[in-house]
Amino acid sequence: MFSELINFQNEGHECQCQCGSCKNNEQCQKSCSCPTGCNSDDKCPCGNKSEETKKSCCSGK
């Protein structure tokens, strides 16, 4: 599991966020480069969780 997260960071994934709290979450923004126009849930392809919702803000897609 952890190696997958490291791979995501190393591969420079494109981050297509459907953001709720993800776009307001510093850690998600750092890892994911979430765009500011997000208005949906909090998912983007990186390994973090939203501090607010405790849900994954990222998916492995």
Curated annotation (Swiss-Prot):
Alphabetically, the GO molecular function entries are: antioxidant activity; cadmium ion binding; copper ion binding; superoxide dismutase activity
Organism, by scientific name, is Saccharomyces cerevisiae (strain ATCC 204508 / S288c) (Baker's yeast)
Annotated Cu cation 7 binding sites = 32, 34, 46
Cross-referenced Pfam families: Metallothio_yeast
Q: What is this protein called?
A: Copper metallothionein 1-1
Which residues of the sequence carry a binding annotation for Cu cation 5? 19, 38
Per the record, the gene is CUP1-1
Task: Return the GO cellular component terms, semicolon-separated.
Answer: cytosol; mitochondrial intermembrane space
Instruction: Please list the residues that bind Cu cation 6.
Output: 22, 28, 46
Residues that, per the record, bind Cu cation 3: 17, 22, 34
* Basic and acidic residues composition bias: residue spans: 40-55
Alphabetically sorted, this entry's keywords are: Copper, Isopeptide bond, Metal-binding, Metal-thiolate cluster, Ubl conjugation
Q: Propeptide positions, renumbered to this chain?
A: 1-8
Q: What else is known?
A: There are 2 copies for copper thionein in yeast. The 2 identical copies CUP1-1 and CUP1-2 are arranged in tandem.
Binding, Cu cation 4: 19, 22, 44
Q: Where is this cross-link: Glycyl lysine isopeptide (Lys-Gly) (interchain with G-Cter in ubiquitin)?
A: 30
Where along the sequence do coiled-coil regions lie?
none
Function noted in UniProt:
Protects the cell against copper toxicity by tightly chelating copper ions. May also act as a depository for copper designated for the effective transfer into the apo forms of copper proteins.
Residue positions binding Cu cation 1: 15, 17, 32
Q: Where is this region: Disordered?
A: 37-61
The residues listed in the UniProt record as binding Cu cation 8, with positions renumbered to this chain, are 34, 38, 44
Q: Might you name a Gene Ontology BP term for this protein?
A: response to copper ion
User: What Gene3D superfamilies does the record point to?
Assistant: Metallothionein domain superfamily, yeast
| Family, per entry | Belongs to the metallothionein superfamily. Type 12 family.
